[in-house]
Amino acid sequence: MGSNSSKISDLPKNEYLKRLSGPEAISENDPFWNQLFSFSFSAPTSSTELKLLEEATISVCKSLVENNPRTGNLAALTKVFLARTRELRLSAECQNHIFIWQTHNALFIICCLLKVFICEMSEEELQLHFTYEEKLPGTYTLCVLLGSDSEDLLEELLCSLIQLITDTPLLDITYEISVEAISAMIVFLSCQLFHKEVLRQSISHKYLMQGPCLPYTSKLVKTLLYNFIRQEKPPPPGTHVFPQQSDGGGLLYGLASGVATGLWTVFTLGGVGSKAASPELTSPLANQSLLLLLVLVNLTDAPDIPNPYRQAVTSFKNTQDSSPFPSSVPHTFQINFNSLYTTLCEQQTSDQATLLLYTLLHQNANVRTYMLARTDMENLVLPILEILYHVEERNSHHVYMALIILLILTEDDGFNRSIHEVILKNITWYSERVLTEISLGSLLILVVIRTIQYNMTRTRDKYLHTNCLAALANMSAQFRSLHQYAAQRIISLFSLLSKKHNKVLEQATQSLRGSLSSSDVPLPDYAQDLSVIEEVIRMMLEIINSCLTNSLHHNPNLVYALLYKRDLFEQFRTHPSFQDIMQNIDLVISFFSSRLLQSGAELSVERVLEIIKQGVVALPKDRLKKFPELKFKYVEEEQPEEFFIPYVWSLVYNSAVGLYWNPQDIQLFAMDSD
């Protein structure tokens, strides 16, 4: 490659890489390793740059695959790295920049090679490559794994990465190696990307769920969570770990000099400080930590061993909680819930933060109880509502997660009451109407109804409808002081459903007539469409009825909207599917219509509301028929991993810092999906 070369495409010609991947065995104490690890460059950031690096690595790997059975150089490289990691903590404490820099570079090389190996070969073949040792010329064998002196180098490497993540103090000089270790663990598990089916057993599963890695479970999960919570930014370029060149030059690359004699010269590709990072990537460490955490939590259970990382995530407690952990709960730890809550509120623009929030609310009772007791729930709910409001800009999975979070929250009556007590001013992102003052509860209703209407006209996803309506139903008995616009939108949605019902009914009638005259043409299933729309209408009527039955006196604006559009409900009074639920609505409409009639014509809005408020007191409550309380609970579908594992890996594919996979190699999810 030479000291002046700066192109990634030159990497396969580089003398050090050629020697590593060539036919000559390199012993672990050869000075070559220091030379190999003494490079510096601005890390590739764009997909184009990362693709070039990947292609260059593939070329090196082909040679290594061919020669490694004779040389054992992959094992030697790994052992040199492992020896260095044992001294890493001391080096950090002693501010040994050069040692940390070289160890980072060793890990970077291993990670690049590992990524290509995992894509190109089976796990068994990969494991085999880590067992080859240096042999006499003309012969090659592998270590006998079952022998008394055998070692599983791949497992040792994974354990070393976990220890590096959990035990290395986070300093400016260790930031990059911490990120690289997390990236390497993601790469280690990336074999899932190259399988259409969800992997239920693999070598990496075995390593992580039993053996020497297992005791680090809670420590690893806690570290990854705190990395996410702290959102540590990378050190400024001036405090980079790469050492400045001394007068003698030697093997070290000087950042300012533009001269290098190590493996790679500076890649003039940009990097830290070259361009403004997107908001999600202001902390590569936090981003990468969260992605790894989600991957670990969503690993499938082993046949006889539940996923320990999921156990850790579902059972951790607040640092202020002094109660003992149940003895039956493994992998326990404590974390600062206030800090966790604050970061979750701030980071909801990303899919992965929303997925973490969902996971914690759904599976960790301690977190759920804590969050529902907060007096500032608007900080959490508003970002979720904003995701739903901009539904057309979000992928469907992100929208689902946001909706399910709302559904889980609305299972709690205390939440449903408190959101109507929180008054918000000037919601700038809500553009359909100026909302100078509105309760959080009314805003939630507006956004959920808007999501339903969007779904009706665009995606027509029944699953989306069901979750939206379930959240509204859970809230309905606790509706309080609904904003007039929220009340109008409830009735407007019913109006839209009514028109859709009439249209489908007309189409079904015409279709039936057509079928009588011609039996050859296949007809659309309007009966199915009608059944679905009637189910949704029934749900809306139950929501309105629930509010009228339980909190009529708190909601004059809903009664006003009901009276204003009373004709809408006429056609459903005698409909067999809605007769029972229409009784109370019909009674309320009749009662208040009569009182308005008695008060004369040309009444102002203020006067009508006054009559409604007076009438509420006079309405005989015993005449309202009681219905079972509307309560819906979110339950994960069977085999949730079929949804979550492809989703998590799509987030890794799209959001991981500095990791690139060829889209043509991806089997787990469709590349054209959102």
UniProtKB/Swiss-Prot annotation:
Necessary for correct organization of Golgi apparatus. Involved in bone development. GO terms for cellular component: cytoplasm; Golgi apparatus; membrane. One of its GO terms (biological process) is bone development. One of its GO terms (molecular function) is enzyme binding. Myristoylated in vitro; myristoylation is not essential for protein targeting to Golgi compartment. This is Dymeclin. PANTHER family: DYMECLIN. It is found in: Cytoplasm; Golgi apparatus; Membrane. It comes from the Eukaryota. InterPro entries: Dymeclin. Pfam families: Dymeclin. Interacts with GOLM1 and PPIB. Disulfide bonds: none annotated. Keywords: Cytoplasm, Golgi apparatus, Lipoprotein, Membrane, Myristate. It is a lipid-anchor. Belongs to the dymeclin family. A lipid is attached at residue 2 (N-myristoyl glycine).
